[in-house]
Regions:
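A short, solvent-exposed loop/turn motif at the edges and junctions
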Residues: 185-196
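Substrate-binding cleft of secreted/luminal carbohydrate-active enzymes
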Residues: 433-444, 456-463, 469, 476-540
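Short, acidic Ser/Thr/Gly-rich low-complexity loop/linker segments typical of extracellular
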Residues: 152-154, 162-176
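Extracellular beta-sheet/turn segments enriched in Thr/Pro/Gly and aliphatic residues
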Residues: 113-134, 196-213
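Structural motif
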Residues: 135-154
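Aromatic-lined carbohydrate-recognition surfaces of secreted/lumenal glycan-active proteins
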Residues: 290-300, 357, 383-422, 463, ...
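Glycine-rich, aromatic-flanked loop segments that form ligand/cofactor-binding clefts
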Residues: 242-245, 273-322, 355-359
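Active-site-adjacent "subsite" loops/lids of carbohydrate-active enzymes
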Residues: 210-226, 293, 298-350, 504
Length: 541
């Protein structure tokens, strides 16, 4: 790598000051506006040969707020949404406002009101098979993995003592236990994980189907009791049953006291620290909530700044290259970068998450791309092995500790036969994942899809076709498709509000195409509760 020059210490100091100012600004915004942040600058358009469309926007977008607007439109594929009167009242008042009745909620951290903890409507079904105290595994452990109807689940993962094997066509397995081996974890995409305590008799592991229906909590949102309480209300009262939490956010910060040496050395301990993070995850799990750790991977301003030898380099300056948000990226070809992210994911698994989801697991799409230099030539022949190689290693290492592994991909990967110039192609990625999570926001399809030039006017069709094509291209693998859906105002076409009709159309499109659950994206964590079905024994799972 080229040296940064004599001005490097001064530049590094200025960058740290800028990061500090950015953190203070975000914290102030979170307090005053319920975590509203400004949209990123418009990226430069590029043309990708032999593809449906080039990527011209970042994969994560900013909701521009909601307003009542006109009466909701009707969309093809839109089935009856829940009546407003059938849903509980979920007031979304800003923290600074008074609660109904004029009473001000009790102050908590950063002055936010603390909502009462909301117990589940019914005790969640157990996800553990306990055993008597003092019981240990026999030397050879055998058993079967079944679904609730007693049918075998071929290919289910059985994890014991850091080793993972697959059940055979009859759902049967046999493995050797080590002295002092802890609990066994049994899992299969589309089902809840099952934790089995040591026992002497053969194991009969019955897995329950799980279609995760999630809301996203930002790096700052998860630390805010007001925001967290509103999402908890939705988890308790509506069909939501899962949550996505930033474990390494868009700037590379970690929201809890990390013990990963490389992260501490890089300064990844963020400005917000949740003291009892394990307790938070345990509380979600006690409510029957499926927990997903989001790890932003190759977009990492913290690591790139601390370790410029691992960064994408700007050929004009010899310093870390930055995108349109002035954030640096680390080099996807560097296996030390792979190890860094996997170790952070391991720590998330130890804290109790069910799944690790890698985001920005790709090459950059905006900024002066021609000035970006990598450890290897940047071409399709090199990009695909880099991204797929990272995911293969992550799935191998994290699968052996008992968590599911997922990755976020652009929605256009459903249609493009190329790698979209970012190292993402379904056929190469699917074999190394439990869940593949396309970002099928209609606003993100800036030139439409075949047959639909205006995607925001056709949310059902856009989501349905995207999920259908990805499932088709992933045939022969165990991966399940769980898309990200749009719960924010359109920013690319007519700025329409995405309300009940648009959100239900997306959900129906995913369900009808065979998606296994879905996730709602809103960077303000301000979700449209009226679009969600009320909680019921069937909707809860």
């Amino acid at each position: 790598m080229e040296a940064a020059g004599e001005g490097a210490p001064k530049a590094a100091a200025l960058r740290h000051l800028a990061d500090g100012g950015y953190a203070v600004g975000l914290l102030a915004s979170a307090v005053l506006f319920g975590y509203a942040i400004l949209p990123p600058s418009s990226p430069q358009a590029r043309t990708v040969p032999t593809t449906v469309a080039a990527v011209t926007s970042t994969d994560r977008t900013i909701g521009l707020g909601k307003s009542p607007g006109p009466a909701p439109p009707s969309y093809p594929g839109l089935r009856a949404a829940p009546r407003e009167s059938a849903l509980p009242s979920l007031a979304r008042t800003l923290p600074a406002e008074r609660a109904p009745g004029g009473a001000r909620p009790a102050p908590t951290e950063r002055g936010r009101g603390r909502p009462a903890l909301l117990p589940p409507l019914a005790p969640p079904a157990p996800r553990e098979m306990p055993a008597s105290e003092g019981v240990t595994w026999p030397e050879r452990v055998s058993g079967r993995v079944l679904d609730p109807d007693g049918l075998p689940l071929a290919g289910a993962s059985v994890v014991l003592a850091g080793r993972e094997l697959r059940a055979d066509a009859d759902g049967a397995f046999t493995l050797t236990a080590s002295p002092g081996s802890g609990p066994m974890i049994v899992k299969l995409p589309g089902y809840d994980r099952l934790v089995v305590a040591p026992r002497r008799e053969p194991v009969e592991a019955v897995l329950r189907p799980r279609a995760a229906k999630a809301a996203y909590l930002t790096y700052f949102g998860v630390a805010d009791r007001g925001i967290r309480g509103r999402v908890l209300a939705l988890l308790t009262r509506t069909e939501l049953n899962a949550v996505v939490i930033d474990v390494k956010g868009d700037r590379g910060w970690i929201p809890y006291r990390t013990e990963v040496p490389a992260a501490l050395a890089a300064g990844a301990q963020g400005p917000v620290i949740i003291r009892d993070f394990e307790g938070l995850i345990a509380d979600f799990r006690a409510r029957g909530v499926y927990t997903i750790a989001r790890v932003v991977t190759f977009k990492d301003n913290v690591l790139a700044t601390a370790r410029p030898d691992l960064a994408v380099v700007d050929t004009r300056t010899g310093k870390p290259w930055v995108d349109n948000e002035k954030l640096a990226w680390v080099d996807p070809f560097r296996e030390e970068v792979w190890a860094y992210n996997i170790e952070i994911a391991r720590e998330a698994a130890r804290k109790g998450f069910d799944e690790v989801q890698f985001d920005y697991v790709r090459f950059p799409t905006d900024g002066r791309l021609g000035s970006a230099r990598y450890a290897k030539p940047n071409s399709r022949a090199t990009r695909l092995p880099a991204v797929a190689g990272f995911l293969e290693r992550a799935r191998r290492e994290l699968g052996a500790v008992g968590v599911y592994v997922a990755a976020d991909v652009f929605g256009y990967t459903a249609f493009n036969e190329s790698d979209t110039d970012i190292g993402q192609r379904i056929e190469e990625l699917a074999p190394h994942l439990d869940y593949i999570c396309p970002m099928v926001y209609p606003s993100g399809y800036h030139v439409g899809i075949p047959g639909y030039r205006n995607p925001v006017a056709n949310p059902y069709a856009v989501v349905h076709e995207s999920v259908r094509l990805i499932r088709k291209r992933a045939e022969g693998t165990q991966v399940r498709v769980r898309p990200w859906l749009q719960d924010f105002r359109d920013y690319a076409f007519d700025r329409r509000v995405f309300g009940v009709a648009e959100i239900r159309a997306q959900i129906n499109g995913s369900d009808d195409a065979g998606g296994v659950g879905w996730m709602l994206w809103n960077p303000r964590n301000d979700y449209t509760g009226e679009a969600l079905l009320p909680k019921s024994p069937l909707a809860a799972r």
